[in-house]
Amino acid sequence: MRSPFPVPMVPLTIKTWQKKLPNWLTIYRIFIAVPTIIFLGLNHLLGSVASFTVLGNVTIHLQVSLFIGGVLFITAVISDYLDGYWARKWRVVSNFGKLWDPLADKVIINGVLIALVAYGYFHFSFLIVIVLRDLVLDGLRFYAQEKQLIIPANQWGKWKTTWQMIAILMSCFVFSFSLKETNSANTKIFYWAIVHLPYYLATAFSLVSFGIYAQQIYKTIKVKVKL
């Protein structure tokens, strides 16, 4: 994902570790998916809960494994921004990064989404739409490359990834903490809204970005055929 921070354009003396660091962050994002999914599974299987009291009379229950999984995912999100930012800042964008950076995003995001669905944290219909969209879109990208078509990425796809990350973090941290009084209707509505709204937004951005990309490919092919 493209970093929102400005990249200075000044002469640089690049050290070896600076050339390698963005790629190592990409590799880290792939491998951190495994312990993240494991901790989500441990929470589902063991249900380790720590309870503590705040403000004198409010009891909070913390699902430890789910919380740790959320923290690990945050490190993946941070690495996603930093590898792109540093690669452009130091002008060390590599073919490895171009290939593996988007794949690393798919591994960590789709892997965690599958785990959350398997453990019942949100409905599988969201996952089906998102995964099918990615598969078809990857096929279209491969077709475009084979035909030497230049199809620029659109901002909707970046928003899709952003909302997917927000949705995962909401699932991990909202479900990690629960008050003792969680049976009230208002509390249930709040939990449902804050967890599910990001998934709806991520799904909407997925469909819109897919439609835009497919339309761009169709128009490009049409123009090329006329030529």
From Swiss-Prot:
<dbReference type="GO" id="GO:0008444">
    <property type="term" value="F:CDP-diacylglycerol-glycerol-3-phosphate 3-phosphatidyltransferase activity"/>
</dbReference>
<dbReference type="InterPro" id="IPR048254">
    <property type="entry name" value="CDP_ALCOHOL_P_TRANSF_CS"/>
</dbReference>
<dbReference type="Pfam" id="PF01066">
    <property type="entry name" value="CDP-OH_P_transf"/>
</dbReference>
<feature type="transmembrane region" description="Helical">
    <location>
        <begin position="112"/>
        <end position="132"/>
    </location>
</feature>
<dbReference type="InterPro" id="IPR043130">
    <property type="entry name" value="CDP-OH_PTrfase_TM_dom"/>
</dbReference>
<dbReference type="InterPro" id="IPR000462">
    <property type="entry name" value="CDP-OH_P_trans"/>
</dbReference>
<dbReference type="GO" id="GO:0006655">
    <property type="term" value="P:phosphatidylglycerol biosynthetic process"/>
</dbReference>
<comment type="similarity">
    <text>Belongs to the CDP-alcohol phosphatidyltransferase class-I family.</text>
</comment>
<feature type="transmembrane region" description="Helical">
    <location>
        <begin position="58"/>
        <end position="78"/>
    </location>
</feature>
<protein>
    <recommendedName>
        <fullName>CDP-diacylglycerol--glycerol-3-phosphate 3-phosphatidyltransferase</fullName>
        <ecNumber>2.7.8.5</ecNumber>
    </recommendedName>
</protein>
<feature type="transmembrane region" description="Helical">
    <location>
        <begin position="30"/>
        <end position="50"/>
    </location>
</feature>
<dbReference type="InterPro" id="IPR004570">
    <property type="entry name" value="Phosphatidylglycerol_P_synth"/>
</dbReference>
<dbReference type="InterPro" id="IPR050324">
    <property type="entry name" value="CDP-alcohol_PTase-I"/>
</dbReference>
<keyword id="KW-0594">Phospholipid biosynthesis</keyword>
<feature type="transmembrane region" description="Helical">
    <location>
        <begin position="159"/>
        <end position="179"/>
    </location>
</feature>
<keyword id="KW-0808">Transferase</keyword>
<keyword id="KW-0472">Membrane</keyword>
<keyword id="KW-1133">Transmembrane helix</keyword>
<keyword id="KW-1003">Cell membrane</keyword>
<keyword id="KW-0812">Transmembrane</keyword>
<feature type="transmembrane region" description="Helical">
    <location>
        <begin position="192"/>
        <end position="212"/>
    </location>
</feature>
<dbReference type="GO" id="GO:0005886">
    <property type="term" value="C:plasma membrane"/>
</dbReference>
<comment type="function">
    <text>This protein catalyzes the committed step to the synthesis of the acidic phospholipids.</text>
</comment>
<keyword id="KW-1208">Phospholipid metabolism</keyword>
<keyword id="KW-0443">Lipid metabolism</keyword>
<keyword id="KW-0444">Lipid biosynthesis</keyword>
<comment type="pathway">
    <text>Phospholipid metabolism; phosphatidylglycerol biosynthesis; phosphatidylglycerol from CDP-diacylglycerol: step 1/2.</text>
</comment>
